[in-house]
């Protein structure tokens, strides 16, 4: 399947398919015509010999320095080279592919004033490769200047840029937007897996399902809560927990009782952030922009993507209690006084070995690190002395996206432990009748990690379970 770029309707799932699935991309004829029209406006403005930021002047603190027509080619070359200050590891291929896609879609919008030939060059790098090498660190989010300079340097390959095209290539947030989109897609899969693990926890703990009573949705009309209640009810359809007397407690610990509420809040946050991502994937991030019907270029601040950066902060904050609760539930399953099962989920009481007890330390370490990553970053301050006090604020959008991705990786590892612990507890409860969804989840886990019997080592390699999460196996 080919994704056709119009500049207006690129969806999150399309970016994921292109970035990870290798789908090809092309630009719509209407978008090509729009780029030709706005480029003609740029050429006419050039003929008027006006002072226009980034077109006939330098950038940043050098906005007062005139760039003449015969200097444009060299100016573009140096602009890109001088911004290649990125540090750290190389971005993954999927992030680079997503960045190329977002850049091309921004050009297709027509506000950049670049020639269609440049947009086609971006598409060719995406479809045919080789992919540019892009460093991950160095952007404050007021345009991903270092990353976009790396990207442009990697695919231009002798292509001669026209006036404004150098600035259009680097003065945008395509790297942050693509990184955010991929992380948010992963977050959706993680939340699905957390629902499944949470449902299996309820059965492993022999918890009280009064928390799923329909009155909860009626009295607290949050979309995320309602969706979570419906999903947990479906996962637990047919479970022994619906039988009279199945629950061990009148009220369970809060991390069991509040599971729908906590997960629901995260789902509300996710829905909001997904909307922000899709807006940003199709919004102009340029400065200046071409206003065709006025035959002019207008200086703006479209590179300030605080709506996305703050939303990513919001999602991490909402995800932290979900992970903390998962950690607490699995630890309680390991504790005999709370679970009613042998300590550490050993085969029987009185054994000297720890069985799965030490998983509690691993889960606490993962959770502590994840919570630290939830700290908001979009309110960080830039130095007002650089350059000449002009660039005096930031969004830190790339950091916000990177921290979400790191938090999700930790979450995947935590949920892998949670699923294994819950499966062990279910086995020790003599394998009661599980729900339709939890039966499937239990089987998937047990196909990869067997029951831990007397003398068995702790199942340290949980990557097969993590791969289930990443594959979307728990999203069905």
Spans of features found by a protein language model:
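FAD-binding glycine-rich core of flavoenzymes that anchor FAD
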Residues: 110-137
């Amino acid at each position: 399947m080919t994704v056709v770029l119009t500049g207006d309707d690129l969806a999150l799932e399309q970016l994921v398919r292109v970035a990870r699935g290798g789908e090809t991309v092309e630009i719509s004829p209407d978008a090509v015509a729009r780029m030709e029209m706005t480029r003609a406006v740029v050429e006419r403005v050039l003929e008027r010999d006006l002072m226009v930021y980034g077109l006939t002047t330098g950038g940043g603190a050098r906005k007062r320095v005139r760039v003449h027509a015969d200097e444009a080619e060299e100016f573009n070359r140096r602009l890109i080279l001088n911004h290649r200050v990125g540090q750290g590891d190389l971005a993954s291929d999927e992030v680079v592919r997503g960045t190329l896609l977002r850049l091309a879609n921004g050009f297709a919008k027509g506000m950049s004033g670049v020639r269609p030939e440049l947009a086609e060059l971006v598409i060719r790098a995406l479809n045919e490769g080789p992919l540019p090498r892009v460093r991950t660190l160095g952007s404050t989010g007021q345009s991903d200047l270092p990353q976009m300079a790396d990207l442009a340097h990697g695919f231009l390959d002798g292509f001669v840029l026209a006036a404004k095209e150098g600035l259009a290539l680097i003065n945008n947030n395509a790297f942050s937007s693509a990184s955010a989109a991929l992380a948010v897609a992963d977050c959706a899969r993680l939340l699905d897996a957390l629902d499944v693990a949470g449902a299996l926890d309820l059965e492993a703990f022999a918890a009280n399902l009064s928390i799923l009573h329909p009155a909860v949705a009626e009295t607290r009309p949050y979309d995320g809560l309602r969706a979570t209640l419906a999903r947990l009810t479906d996962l637990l359809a047919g479970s022994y927990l619906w039988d009279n007397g199945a629950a061990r407690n009148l009220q369970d610990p809060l991390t069991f009782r509040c599971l729908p509420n906590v997960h629901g809040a995260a789902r509300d946050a996710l829905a909001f952030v997904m909307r922000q991502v899709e807006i940003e994937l199709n919004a102009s991030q340029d400065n200046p922009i071409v206003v065709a019907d006025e035959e002019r270029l207008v200086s703006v601040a479209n590179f300030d993507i605080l709506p996305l950066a703050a939303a990513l902060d919001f999602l991490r904050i909402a995800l932290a209690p979900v992970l903390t609760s998962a950690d607490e539930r699995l630890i309680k399953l390991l504790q005999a006084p709370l679970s009613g099962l042998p300590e550490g989920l050993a085969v029987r009481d009185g054994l000297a070995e720890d069985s799965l007890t030490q998983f509690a330390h691993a889960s606490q370490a993962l959770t502590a690190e994840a919570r630290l990553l939830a700290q908001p970053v979009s309110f960080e301050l830039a130095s007002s002395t650089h350059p000449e006090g002009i660039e005096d604020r930031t969004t830190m959008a790339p950091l916000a996206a990177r921290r979400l991705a790191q938090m999700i990786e930790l979450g995947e590892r935590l949920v892998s432990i949670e699923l294994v612990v819950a499966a062990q507890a279910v086995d020790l409860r003599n394998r009661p009748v599980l729900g339709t969804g939890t039966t499937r989840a239990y089987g998937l886990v047990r196909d990869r990690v067997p029951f831990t019997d007397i003398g068995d080592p702790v199942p340290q390699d949980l990557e097969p379970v993590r791969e289930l999460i990443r594959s979307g196996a728990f999203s069905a």
